[in-house]
C-alpha cells in the first residue's frame, strides 16, 4: 500500500526532515566550539580549566533561567558557586573535594528553597553541571592517557551527534519519545550509535591498540555514544519539565551550552565513573602499552 503523504502526520514528518534552515549556523558554530575544545584539551591545565569555567558560567545561567525565571540572579549565584567551586577543586586535582563541595551545596539548597521540588531543582542543577565538569578536568589530568581519553570522548560523541542528526533528518521513521522530543527518531539513535562505535574503533587504531583491544574500543565506543544520545534525550526531558524549547540562544543553530554539550556531559559521567571506580576499565582501554 502506498503511504498517504497528504495527511497531517506525514506532512509534519516531511517538514521536519526537510528543514535544513539552521544547518549553516549549526556547522559554523560547531566548528568554532570544536576547535576551541580541542585546543584547550591539548594544552590542558589552566587553559582547559578556563574553558570549563566559562561553560559552567553559561550553563549555570541557563539553568537558573529555566528553573527560577522569577529569581534568576540568586539562583544563578547559587548554581555558579556550586558548579564553579567543583571546577576549581578539580583543576587543583582534588576530585574528592569537588564532590564534597557539591554535596554541601546540595544540602545548603534546602535552606534557600525549602520545598522538595525547589531543592531538587537547585541541588540537581549544581550537580548536573558541576559533576561532569569536574570529572572532565580529572580525566584530562590523568597520566599518561588523559589527553587520549578526552580526544576519544570528543571523537565518539561528535561522530555520534553528527550521524544521529543527519540519520534522523534523512531517514526519519518512528519517533523515540514524542512527548519529550518530537524530532528524535530510532534511525538517528541507530546511526549515531553505529558512528560512535566506528569512531571508537578508529581511536583504538590511532592509539596503537592491538587487534583485541580495538574490539574493546568498538564496543565501548557504542556504549559511550548511546549514553551520550540518552543524555541528549534527558536534556529534552528537563526542558520539557521547565517548559522551554532551548536552554538559551547563545549558540546559533544549537540553542544553549546545555543543549550543545548534553551528550558530552553524559558520556563524561560514564567514562569518568568507570575509570575512577573501576580500575579494570583503564586497563581495558589502555592496556595495550600506550
Region spans (language model):
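Membrane-embedded alpha-helical bundles of polytopic integral membrane proteins
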Residues: 2-222
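Generic detector of well-ordered alpha-helical packing
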Residues: 27, 63, 162, 233-236, ...
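Short helical (or helix-break) motifs at transmembrane helix termini and adjacent helical loops
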Residues: 159-169, 227-238
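Re-entrant/interfacial helical elements at transmembrane boundaries that shape
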Residues: 169-170, 239-242, 265, 269
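Interfacial loop-to-transmembrane junctions
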Residues: 241-264
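Final/C-terminal transmembrane alpha-helix of multipass membrane proteins
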Residues: 260-277
